[in-house]
Every structure is written in C-alpha cells, then in structure tokens.
Regions:
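Generic cytosolic/nucleocytoplasmic N-terminal low-complexity/intrinsically disordered segments
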Residues: 1, 36-39, 83
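Compact, glycine-rich, soluble single-domain proteins
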Residues: 8-43, 48, 52-56
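C-terminal structural segments of small proteins and small subunits
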Residues: 51-85
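Intrinsic-disorder/low-complexity, polar/charged segments enriched in Ser/Thr/Lys/Arg/Asp/Glu/Gln
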Residues: 1-5, 60-62
C-alpha cells in the first residue's frame, strides 16, 4: 500500500475539469485508489465521490493506492496533483 498527502493549491479547489481528469487517471490503474479529506474516504475512480469531497484551496487530501501497480499509480497520481491542482 502506498499513501501520500497533498495540499490543494488551485484557487478553485477540485472542480469539474481536473476532477474528471484525475478520475480518468485513477481508472487507468488496476490498483484500488482512494482519496480522503477530513476523515471521509471515497473511491477516486468515481467522479461523484471525488467532487463530493468539496476540497478547496488549502485543504489536504490523502491518496491511498493498493494493488499490483501501486508504485506507478502513486507516483503518477501525485505528479498529476502537483501539475493540475
């Protein structure tokens, strides 16, 4: 299992476009991908769950990846967040 945290930098927070791209990226991996904020954890492969977190600028999210490609998934998803959010 791999886990990392990220503080949202985008002034708009996790909004529709980057949320959709993040979900698409998460779906490209076989591993289970979860995203959590303030103790609420959701499936990162489901757009409504990701949007439902209502993560705004300055909020910390925690990503947990578990499965056969977890190393690659964690690295690529962390890079995605840094580049887009």
């Amino acid at each position: 299992m791999k886990e990392f945290s990220y503080v949202i930098q985008d002034p708009e927070g996790i909004h529709a476009r980057p949320a959709g791209e993040f979900v698409k990226a998460a779906k490209s991996f076989e591993s289970s991908v979860k995203i959590a904020k303030d103790g609420k954890q959701v499936d990162a492969k489901r757009i409504f769950g990701v949007m439902g977190l209502a993560a705004k600028q300055g909020h910390e999210v925690t990503i947990t990846v578990e499965g056969p490609d977890e190393d690659k998934a964690a690295a690529e998803l962390e890079a995605f967040l840094k580049a887009n959010l």
